[in-house]
Amino acid sequence: MKDEHGILIHPYGPHIFHTSNEVVFEYLSRYTTWRHFRHEVVANVHGEYMPVPFNLTTLEKAFKTEAARMKEKLIAAYGMGAKVPILTLMNHEDEELKRVGKYVYDNIYVYYTMKQWGKKPEEIDPAVTARVPVNISYDNGYFADKYQGLPEHGFTPMFEKMLNHENIEVRLNTEAKDILEIK
């Protein structure tokens, strides 16, 4: 999609390649060189910029004086490095951890969901909440994968090179059921 100035934009945000699978990374590297990029997202929550997904840095910014105690409880309950779905925290027996989950849901997840899906959270399958976990770490990166980046010239040229193979025939406007045979 192009904006009013003719600039290509991603209406749903940039598509960033990320994997920890070396075989996948090496395979795709045959078709592109990479612009290494580590995606970090911040949200403006009540006038303060905080990392998303919510992590221990965000916890300290959001809860200030209570953060140290909450951090201890989170680490004791889930372990350092864990990724905890928001609903898990919202249903926790400990009231403070429940409060963390509710804070993330009300101040980050609701807005993320409406922007991402164009729907209210209650209209989305609850399993989707796992996509925006609370990270029990200080890693501000959006992805934890070893390999992250963007194809140097974009995804289209990378896929064009992949499809330019003697064993691949590209068929447009074709129903798969018309050409595939299931045995």
Sequence positions of predicted segments:
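Beta1-alpha1 glycine-rich phosphate/pyrophosphate-binding loop at the start
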Residues: 1-10, 31, 112-117, 124-125
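Dinucleotide-binding Rossmann-like beta1-alpha1 core, especially the glycine-rich loop
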Residues: 5-80
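Active-site/ligand-binding neighborhood in enzyme catalytic cores
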Residues: 46-51, 56-182
